[in-house]
Amino acid sequence: TKNFLPHMVEQGQGHIVNVASVGASFGVPGVASYCATKFAMLGFSEGLKHELSGTGVDVTVVSPIMVDTPLFDHPSFENFSKRSTIAILSPEKVANTILKAANSSKLEIVVPSVARAGIWAKHNFPFFINPIIGNAFRKQLTKRTSKK
């Protein structure tokens, strides 16, 4: 962004697409640092979108729920995908969404779109959703640390 943005503004056109995660909306036990980086990317993208208003340069952040990458090999995610009821997205699906995002005026595109309901529920009913998320991941974290 630092290298290309001045040229985009000079030309009066361009689109920056950043990738975060649905984890930007949920602080999750055991992967707090991961969630923090995603919170940061979403905040950076939102601030930059406001700063660039009227320049012809836009910003969109793509937030996939879970992508089939080596990240799931990390101990923090041990057995998570096996017990998850949420479909894990292919990298190709996310890549296609990133390409489409370059033509979108939205700040954030959540993939799959049904995950937006979880984000909405978390923001509107945190007293209900936060304990569910916390307990589910805490159980996983306890299992992992008790194996050591």
Please annotate each region the language model reported.
Residues 1, 37:
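Active-site helix of classical SDR
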Residues 3-12:
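A short helix-coil junction within the Rossmann-fold of NAD(P)-dependent oxidoreductases
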Residues 6, 50-53:
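Alpha-helical segment proximal to the catalytic Tyr-Lys
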Residues 21:
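Residue(s) in the substrate-gating loop at a strand-loop-helix junction
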Residues 24-26:
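Conserved catalytic-site region of short-chain dehydrogenase/reductase
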Residues 28-32:
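Active-site loop immediately N-terminal to the catalytic Tyr-X3-Lys motif
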Residues 39-46, 50, 57, 96:
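Conserved active-site helix of classical SDR/Rossmann-fold NAD(P)-dependent CH-OH oxidoreductases
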Residues 54-113:
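SDR active-site lid
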